[in-house]
Amino acid sequence: MRNIKTYLSVAPVLATLWFGSLAGLLIEINRLFPDALAFPFFSF
């Protein structure tokens, strides 16, 4: 039971950190490359 409580207290914190950093990364990419639907270095 203690392991379940530890998991339930750690998982939301890790999810918040992950989604927060992902949102920050997307915001910075959109700030550096505005309105980029397709990046030029990905086109072959």
From Swiss-Prot:
Subcellular locations according to the entry: Plastid, Chloroplast thylakoid membrane
Family listed: Belongs to the PsaJ family.
Gene Ontology biological process: photosynthesis
Key words of the record: Chloroplast, Membrane, Photosynthesis, Photosystem I, Plastid, Thylakoid, Transmembrane, Transmembrane helix
Residue spans crossing the bilayer: 7-27
Name listed for the protein in its UniProt record: Photosystem I reaction center subunit IX
Entry GO terms, CC: chloroplast thylakoid membrane; photosystem I
Gene3D superfamilies given in the database record: Single helix bin
Membrane topology: Single-pass membrane protein
InterPro entries for the chain: PSI_PsaJ (IPR002615), PSI_PsaJ_sf (IPR036062)
Record bears the keyword Iron: no
Function: May help in the organization of the PsaE and PsaF subunits.
PANTHER family: PHOTOSYSTEM I REACTION CENTER SUBUNIT IX (PTHR36082:SF2), PTHR36082
Coiled-coil residue windows: none
